[in-house]
Amino acid sequence: MANDAEDAVRSYLTSVKEDLMTGVSFMIPFVTIGGIFLALGYAVASLSNNVQDVFNSTGTAGWFLAQIGVAGLTLMVPVLGAYIAYAIADRPGLAPGFILSYIIQQGNVLQAAGDVIGLQGGSAGAGYLGAIVAGFLAGIVARWFKQRDVPEFIAPMMPVLLIPVATTAVLTPVMLFVLGVPISIANAGLTEFLSNMQGGGQAILLGGILGAMMAADMGGPINKVAYVFSVGLISEGVTAPMAAVMIAGMVPPIGLALSNFIAPQKYAAEMYENAKSGVLLGFSFITEGAIPYAAADPARVIPSVVAGSAVAGAASMALGVNMPAPHGGIFVVPLSNQPFMFIACILLGSIVTAVIATAIKPNFDAKMAAQSSDD
């Protein structure tokens, strides 16, 4: 009985994670377009020493590029909510998820809702936290409507008319007058807290935690929590955590490849070829490139990569490195406010990982002999 309950909980949590990651996967192209074009807009504006007034320079090349960037970053949050709902309820959940996520991003709407319920503080919008809540609720409610038995002549209207309208009607008052304003207050507090964490002890701690999470399971649920957290903050204009996460995610494959090159006797012969591809994967921000090493020797590899990524993430936050793009690795380094420091943090973390892994791993032959004697 206990095992059945445990399996049910595990299955539910897996489903929640998959639904969330569906939303994130559809959101990433919007973040990428938004972040890159906004950065290009600032870069072009800087050529005429007009970087601070890019949005007031109507009709200039920088202004047009920045408008594309703003469009991408504005739509990314509703898209997140829309595709979480889509993952749960398929097509009937898509429009309600988008509309509910969009409406709670409008600060004036939430401020008016706050006036109605006597709670102030919704002017900033509910951010990606609100979109996640709206997406899950829209998906759950739409799926409930979808599972109802209805007369045959009504069935064709259910997915395109009745379910989307009913779901939106049911959840709009909930999101505006119950959940929206408190989530907006929490989102504003989080954004302000992170915006003030530039170079201080709290920033270093946050960078270290995010870095360690990126390396802890190399693409697993812990890694994804850190990644989603940082991607969501891009729409709020907070891009330092994204830099820390990207840098930290690049460290494990590069650091372990470096260790393999320095001390090949500590690894199986076939791992040497894996190291070559690991460098490319690492610089492409594919943390999973370190998994073959972790699978072969988790007790030594995981502490090594966690330490290196934590150091890299902490250094990035301490130095105030920013990254407006959610993916791309070495190919988006020019978009950083400090590209050389971005690369330096990658190298620092990789060296820490390489030194620790090389120091604590025994020679491969000795390790195999010890395992044979244990058997």
Curated annotation (Swiss-Prot):
Protein's cellular compartments: Cell membrane
Q: Which residues belong to any copy of the PTS EIIC type-2 domain?
A: 16-370
Q: What induces it?
A: Expression is highly up-regulated in presence of fructose.
InterPro entries assigned: Bacterial_PTS_Sugar_Transport, PTS_EIIC, PTS_EIIC_2, PTS_IIC_fruc
TM annotation in the entry: 24-44, 68-88, 93-113, 122-142, 160-180, 203-223, 238-258, 279-299, 301-321, 340-360
Phenotype of gene-disrupted mutants: Cells lacking this gene are unable to grow on fructose. Growth on glucose is unaffected.
Membrane topology label? Multi-pass membrane protein
Question: What do the Gene Ontology cellular component annotations say?
Answer: plasma membrane
Keyword hit for RNA-binding: no
What UniProt keywords are attached to this protein's entry?
Cell membrane, Membrane, Phosphotransferase system, Sugar transport, Transmembrane, Transmembrane helix, Transport
Domain of life, source organism: Archaea
Tell me the GO molecular function terms.
carbohydrate:proton symporter activity; protein-N(PI)-phosphohistidine-sugar phosphotransferase activity; protein-phosphocysteine-sugar phosphotransferase activity
Which one GO biological process term can you cite for this protein? phosphoenolpyruvate-dependent sugar phosphotransferase system
- Please name the PROSITE patterns in this protein's record: PTS_EIIC_TYPE_2
Q: What does this protein do?
A: The phosphoenolpyruvate-dependent sugar phosphotransferase system (sugar PTS), a major carbohydrate active transport system, catalyzes the phosphorylation of incoming sugar substrates concomitantly with their translocation across the cell membrane. The enzyme II PtfABC PTS system is involved in fructose transport.
Quote additional remarks: PTS-type transport systems are very rare in archaea.
Record remark: domains:
The EIIC type-2 domain forms the PTS system translocation channel and contains the specific substrate-binding site.
Instruction: Identify this protein by name.
Output: PTS system fructose-specific EIIC component
The record lists the organism as Haloferax volcanii (strain ATCC 29605 / DSM 3757 / JCM 8879 / NBRC 14742 / NCIMB 2012 / VKM B-1768 / DS2)
Identify the taxonomic lineage of the organism of origin.
Answer: Archaea, Methanobacteriati, Methanobacteriota, Stenosarchaea group, Halobacteria
